[in-house]
């Protein structure tokens, strides 16, 4: 019953789709001609009454009614309502098609997994596929009028060969107040397990694959049953139907051509045939007819599913696959391209024009000059970056140092002191002895290994999140250098001195670090995991000894001048430790 026109529209040529308008079976004309004739008849009856049967006063009242209907008829959202409704119906229609039970995959597994060319093996395979076809027929008989007319009772299924008399009696014995389409699938599962126990199915993995495919078909049958049970909500269908028919009932009055002598706006001409009104009826009413035909594709319309053909085809191919084709293979022979590494199947004269070379990619035919294909030295990459590259920030790694701050600087190697205006910026590193320098080098290497890849020197990436005021944790396999052990081992006397009020200048120098740094380190000290920590308590420090102070080489410029001098707190703490020791 399905109207197939795929071959007629295989090639997009002049008139390929226009020829489809001449088809009658499954066409919109066949569905709509009755309603269209009724609409034409009603329109011309109202026109005849307006022109011939009404008095002048009655004509004036009718003309006012016509203008009123014509002005408010566009307020009905017919396109909006029809669009959503038809989309819902078409989606539902296609989902029902996708859930039609095809036994092809199941019959392949049965023919492959259930072994034995004897009478018992043949009986086992045919019975399994007959159960599968019986389950399909029972569900199609429940939802399709065409299949029900073919098998109106279980006795007809027995006479058709889908069921044996003993199986029919078994079904009647297990009669329930529910649809029994699921019973053959239970028989299939039990018989498959029996075949595995009897050695007809070698491995439980094969049995599991067979049952999975069986459950897939059972699920599809359940979906068809649910689609037949749960329809599109009735209120939605009623709203769409009322919207369409009320629109065209208003058109019967509002689209009448009035007397041109009375000079009504928009009624200067008196056309006998309202062409665009008829086209509008054809489009909107035809749109509704599409939804009416697709809402249940298991009927007997021209475009409904061929359910009886599906029943015949499924039984024929499934029994053939598991019986005559079981282990019936053609002999293996060498193909005609056995010694040909590049086989070229021949073309006929009609298909020679469709022969095409292989596609290698859109850039395959691009040609470059010899100079453009030469690699550039690294020192010339920056010069050839171009305006766009400079605009996007494409710079060489040698010209863009990584971003650091006063806290991540602890993990970086110390550089030599820079000079500004003839005065050294930092003279503290020069005063360290050789042992302290070795300790600081070992500590920096340990910090480098414990740092993430993005935090190591030479790694250029986006700015990272600033480090919090938490104690630095060294990995268990790494040990802190000697200098830092002195820092963590400050005696109680030094701690008491650090808690005393410091001078205002020292307070300003370390005002960047809050006093909550000590509180954040307390939970880690009570942890059961052994960790080596270094606590930088820079909140309140006692004044350094005189021999460790730096000479004041720059005029005081307030707190901002002190902040700009990024002094390493590691050196300050180590010198402080030596002073107390």
UniProtKB/Swiss-Prot annotation:
Side of membrane Extracellular, spans: 52-60, 256-274
Reactions the enzyme catalyzes: chloride(in) = chloride(out); hydrogencarbonate(in) = hydrogencarbonate(out); 4-aminobutanoate(in) = 4-aminobutanoate(out); L-glutamate(out) = L-glutamate(in)
Places the protein is found: Cell membrane; Basolateral cell membrane
Topological relation to the membrane, as annotated: Multi-pass membrane protein
Quaternary structure (record): Interacts with YWHAG; this interaction promotes the ligand-gated L-glutamate channel activity leading to the positive regulation of NMDA glutamate receptor activity through the L-glutamate secretion.
Organism whose genome encodes this protein: Sus scrofa (Pig)
Annotated GO CC locations: basolateral plasma membrane; chloride channel complex; membrane microdomain; plasma membrane; presynapse
Example of a GO biological process term: protein complex oligomerization
Stretch list, region Disordered: 416-440
Function (record text): Ligand-gated anion channel that allows the movement of anions across cell membranes when activated by calcium (Ca2+). Allows the movement of chloride and hydrogencarbonate. Found in a partially open conformation leading to significantly smaller chloride movement. Upon F2R/PAR-1 activation, the sequestered calcium is released into the cytosol of astrocytes, leading to the (Ca2+)-dependent release of L-glutamate into the synaptic cleft that targets the neuronal postsynaptic GRIN2A/NMDAR receptor resulting in the synaptic plasticity regulation.
Entry-linked Pfam families: Bestrophin (PF01062)
PANTHER family membership: BESTROPHIN, BESTROPHIN-1
Topology feature Cytoplasmic, residues: 1-31, 83-237, 289-581
Mod. after translation: Phosphorylated (in vitro).
The keyword Thylakoid is annotated on this UniProt entry: no
GO MF annotation: an example: metal ion binding
Name of this protein: Bestrophin-1
Family from the record: Belongs to the anion channel-forming bestrophin (TC 1.A.46) family. Calcium-sensitive chloride channel subfamily.
Domain-related comment: The C-terminal auto-inhibitory segment (AS) modulates the open/closed conformation of the channel. In a closed conformation, the C-terminal auto-inhibitory segment constricts the channel concentrically by wrapping around the channel periphery in an inter-protomer manner. To allow chloride movement, the C-terminal auto-inhibitory segment opens partially, leading to significantly smaller chloride movement.
Keyword set, alphabetical order: Calcium, Cell membrane, Chloride, Chloride channel, Ion channel, Ion transport, Membrane, Metal-binding, Phosphoprotein, Transmembrane, Transmembrane helix, Transport
Transmembrane intervals: 32-51, 61-82, 238-255, 275-288
List of residues binding Ca(2+): 10, 293, 296, 301, 304
């Amino acid at each position: 019953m399905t109207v197939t026109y795929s071959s007629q529209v295989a090639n997009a040529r002049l008139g390929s789709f226009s020829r489809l308008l001449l088809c009658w079976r499954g066409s919109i004309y066949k569905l709509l001609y009755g309603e269209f004739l009724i609409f034409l008849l009603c329109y011309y009856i109202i026109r005849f009454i307006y022109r011939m049967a009404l008095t002048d006063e009655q004509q004036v009242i009718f003309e006012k009614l016509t203008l009123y209907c014509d002005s408010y008829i566009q307020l009905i959202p017919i396109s909006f309502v029809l669009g959503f409704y038809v989309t819902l119906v078409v989606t539902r229609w296609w989902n029902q098609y996708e859930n039609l039970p095809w036994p092809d995959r199941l019959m392949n597994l049965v023919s492959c997994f259930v072994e034995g060319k004897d009478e018992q093996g043949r009986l086992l395979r045919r019975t399994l596929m007959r159960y599968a076809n019986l389950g399909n027929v029972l569900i199609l008989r429940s939802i399709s009028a065409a299949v029900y007319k073919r098998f109106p009772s279980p006795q007809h299924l027995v006479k058709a060969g889908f069921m044996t008399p003993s199986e029919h009696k078994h079904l009647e014995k297990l009669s329930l107040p529910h649809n029994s389409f699921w019973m053959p699938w239970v028989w299939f599962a039990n018989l498959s397990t029996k075949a595995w126990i009897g050695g007809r199915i070698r491995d439980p993995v094969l049995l599991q694959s067979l049952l999975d495919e069986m459950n897939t078909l059972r699920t599809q049958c359940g979906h068809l049953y649910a689609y037949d049970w749960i329809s599109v909500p009735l209120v939605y269908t009623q709203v769409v139907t009322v919207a369409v028919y009320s629109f065209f009932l208003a058109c019967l009055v509002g689209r009448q051509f009035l007397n041109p002598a009375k000079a009504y706006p928009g009624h200067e001409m008196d056309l006998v045939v309202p062409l665009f009104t008829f086209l509008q009826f054809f489009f909107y009413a035809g749109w509704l007819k599409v939804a009416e035909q697709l809402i249940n594709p298991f009927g007997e319309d021209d475009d409904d599913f061929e359910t009886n053909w599906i029943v015949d085809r499924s039984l024929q191919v499934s029994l053939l696959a598991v019986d005559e084709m079981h282990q019936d293979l053609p002999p293996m022979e060498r193909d005609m391209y056995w010694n040909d590494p590049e086989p070229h199947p021949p073309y006929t004269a009609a298909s020679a024009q469709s022969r095409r070379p292989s596609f290698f990619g859109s850039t395959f035919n691009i040609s470059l000059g010899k100079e453009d294909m030469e690699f550039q030295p690294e020192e010339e990459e920056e010069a050839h970056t171009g305006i766009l590259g400079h605009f996007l920030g494409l710079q060489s790694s040698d010209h863009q140092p990584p971003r650091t701050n006063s806290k991540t600087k602890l993990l970086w190697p110390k550089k030599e002191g820079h000079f500004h205006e003839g005065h050294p910026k930092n003279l503290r590193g020069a005063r360290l002895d050789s042992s302290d320098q070795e300790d600081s080098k070992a500590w920096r290497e340990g910090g480098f290994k414990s740092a993430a890849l993005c935090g190591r020197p030479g790694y250029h990436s986006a700015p990272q999140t600033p480090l919090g005021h938490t104690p630095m944790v060294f990995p268990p396999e790494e040990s802190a250098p000697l200098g830092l052990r002195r820092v963590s081992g400050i005696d109680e006397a030094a701690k008491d001195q650090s808690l005393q009020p410091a001078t205002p200048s020292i307070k300003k120098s370390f005002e960047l670090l809050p006093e909550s740094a000590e509180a954040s380190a307390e939970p880690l000290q009570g942890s059961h995991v052994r960790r080596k920590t270094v606590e930088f308590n820079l909140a309140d420090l006692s004044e350094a000894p005189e021999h460790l102070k730096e000479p004041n080489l720059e005029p005081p410029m307030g707190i901002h001048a002190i902040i700009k001098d990024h002094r390493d707190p590691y050196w300050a703490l180590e010198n402080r430790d030596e002073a107390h020791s």
